[in-house]
Amino acid sequence: MSRTAPSSLAPGQDLPDDVAYLLQRAVSGVLRAAQNGDLPLFAWTLGLPQDELLEVLAKLFPEVEPVEPLRDVQYQQLLALKPRDFQSMLRLLEQSRNPQLPERKIRWLAHAMTAACYGEHELWRDMGLGDMTDLARLMQVCFPPLYERQRIGQNWKQLLLSRLHDG
């Protein structure tokens, strides 16, 4: 029996409301954790170029005043703190993305999720989600091939790290 929910989305359609909400929670959770020192400082960038991070903030949190950009040299110093395997982990997620969903928003989620992988807690906690069912919902809808590979009792960080080191 397949664990993947049947898709009712047409290609390019926006995210389901619950997934859009969880994307906002994940991005804000990772940014908050980085600012509080619970994630490495690079996570505050989500590993994105500064103009794209500012776009993420404007699109996901339109009620918030526009964020003043850092000087480029400061932002580049933060990005330089990314772990060496960040891009490989990110690629694993992006290659598993649901092609029916908006590519840009799933890219943002993949960046937030990858940054959260460098925290010390379970992935859902490091992403600022309510519980592991929130993360399972994101994985099921946004990264179905990875959702299918998760074994009962295996946490999501274990799955991602094992896939990274196997591939």
Where are these regions (language model features)?
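Cysteine-cluster motifs in flexible loop/terminal segments that predominantly coordinate metals
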Residues: 162-167
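Hydrophobic, aromatic-lined core segments that form the binding pocket/scaffold
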Residues: 2-160
